[in-house]
C-alpha cells in the first residue's frame, strides 16, 4: 500500500500522474484524514465536494494517536528535524499501517522517511 501525502495530490491535480492513477485503479492508495483536511484548506478540483468525497472514500491509513506520535518523535529523534505535526503523523501512520510506504514530493519528509524504510519511489513502479 502507498500513503500519498498532500504534495502528491496537489501535483496530480495540476497534472495527472500515471503512477498515482495506476495505484488508484489497483486499490493500492491509502489516504489520511490530515491529508484530506490539508486539501480541503486549498483548492481541490471542481466539483470540490465530489473530489473531497472521493478522497474520503479511499482506504484510510491507520491514524496514530497523539500519544503514539509523541512517543514516535522521541524514539526516532524527530525533534528539530524541520517537520511539523502533519508530517510526523503521516510517518507514524505509514509505520503502523501494514506494508505501507509513504509517497511525498516534500524533500524534508522524504529525507525522514528514507531511514525508516518507508519511502515510496514512483520510478520503481
Indicate where each model-derived feature is located.
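Preference for short coil/turn "hinge" residues that link or interrupt alpha-helices
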Residues: 6, 54, 76-79
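Short, structurally constrained coil/turn elements
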Residues: 23-25, 54, 96, 114
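Short, acidic/turn-prone active-site loops that include or flank metal/cofactor-
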Residues: 14, 33-36, 57, 108, ...
